[in-house]
Amino acid sequence: MLDLKIVNGKIIDVENRKIIEGDLGIKDGAIIHMGHVTAQSRKVIDAEGHYVSPGFIDIHMHEEDFTLTKKQEYDISATMLNMGVTTCVAGNCGNNRQSIEMLSEFIEEKGNPVNYMSYIGHNYLRNQVGSTDIYKRSTMSQIKKMQSMTLEAIDFGAVGVSYGLEYCPGIDLEEAIEITEHIRGRNDLLLSAHYRKDAVNALDSINEMAEIAKETKIPFQISHLSSCSAFGNMTEALKLIENIKLNGIDLSVDAYPYAAFSTFIGSAVFDEGCFESWNKSYDSIMLTEEPFKGVYCNREIFEKARKEYPQMLAVANVMNEDEIVEALNHPMVMIASDGIYRNHSGHPRGAGTFPRVIGHYVREKKSMEFFDAIDKMTLMPAKRLKLKRKGLLKEGFDADIAIFDFDRIIDKATFQDPQLRPEGIKYVILGGQIAINNGNVINNTLGRFYKRGEA
C-alpha cells in the first residue's frame, strides 16, 4: 500500500529534458514507483493537465527573524511554500537572523512550512565577537574567535560560510580568508558572498570573490549576480566568470528575476556615491514599512529613514531588465529569490520568484526555455548543495514535489503587497506528505532542518 499516488501528471524529467506522462508512487517519504503505477494508495492526487516538478530549491534567501515573529508565526517560510519551494538555504549575505542552533531547534520542535539548510555568516560572527564597527577590520583576537566559531558551525552542519562584503566594508580580503583557517580545502563545503560593490565596480568585486575561492580552496557561490552587474556590464561579468572557471576556480552563480533589489535602508549599500554609481536618484528608492510604507524617497526622507529607521527594508529600482534576462539564461546561473521580509514587508521576490520565472519569462515573454528554467530551480541547486536525494523525480529520491498549471502559474506579489500568493501552484508535497492541496495550505509543519550531508 502506497502512502500517496500522483496520477495522470506531466512528470518533468529534468535530466533528460522530457515530459513523462504517467504516475508517481510514494511511500515513507520517497518516490518508489514511476510510470504506470497500479498499486493501491491511501491518498491519490489526480494531476491531469498539470506539470509535476521536483520541489523548487532556493539556494539564496533570508530566513525568519525570531525577534520579530516571536516564534509564533511563519513569515518567509510561508511564502516559500506558497510558490512551490520545498528546500531553502538560510544565513546568506553574511547574516544569520539568529543562531543556526536556534533555527534548527525551532524547526525540530515546531516543524516548518519548508526544509532549511544554513550557512554561518561572517557578518553575524563579527557581531558575536564584538567587531561591530562595519567600517573597521576585526582584530586578530576577534578573528581567532571567529575561526573557532566557524569550525563549530561547520561541525554542527552548516553548508559553509557566507559573506556580506558590501554590508561591512571593514572586511578586507585577508579577513575573509583568515576566518576559514580551520576549514580550507574542504570540497564538501560552499562559500557564498554578497559582492563588495556593484555597477561600475562589479568586475573588481567578482575578481575579489574569485580570489577568496582560490585562496580557501572551497567551492564558491556568487550571490544574486543580477543586482551586482545589471547596470550595463552583465555580458562582461558573465565572461569574466567563465574565464575564472576555465582557470580551475570552482565558481557558480545565482540571480533573481526582478530589476529591483531590497535591503535595509541603513546599510552601507546606500552610502555616499551609490546614486552616482547606479546613475539613479533618490526617487528610485521605495520604503516598505511605516511610517513610510510605499513612499518613494526624496533626499529628506532618504536621510531621515537612514538615521531613524536603519532596519527598515527598502526597494531600489535601479537595474536593467534585459541584463536580468541575460543572466537568467546563462548556463552557469541558477535561480534564487534572495527573499527577505520584516514584519511581512519587503520585496515581492520572496513570494513570486519561481512562479514568475515560469509564468512571465517562459510562458509570456518566451525569453527562457522551459527545461532550462526548471533545471535552474531544481537540479542545479541540488547538485551545488550536494543533495543526493533532491532535485529530481526519480525512484529513491525524496518526494518533494510541486504540481502546477502551466497556463495559469504567475507571480502576484507586488511592491505594495509583497506577500501575495502566486497563482497556479496546485499541490506541494514535502517528504511524501501533502502541504498544499488543490491550492490550499493544509499542513505547514512538514519541513525539517537538514545538516550538511543529511539530504
Functional labels for PLM-detected ranges:
Residues 1-54:
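Histidine-rich, glycine-flanked metal-binding segment
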Residues 9, 24, 29, 49, ...:
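Divalent metal-coordination and catalytic microenvironments
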Residues 12-23, 314-318, 324, 368-374, ...:
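Acidic, glycine-enriched loop/beta-strand segments at the rims
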Residues 52, 61, 71-162, 182, ...:
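Divalent-metal coordination cores built from histidine and acidic residues
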Residues 55-66, 165, 191-197:
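Histidine-centered catalytic micro-motifs
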Residues 87, 113-117, 158-160, 188-192, ...:
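Structural preference for beta-strand elements that scaffold enzyme active sites
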Residues 134-140, 146-159, 163, 223-366:
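Active-site neighborhoods of metal-dependent hydrolases
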Residues 318, 325-332, 337-338, 401-450:
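C-terminal cap of metal-dependent C-N hydrolases
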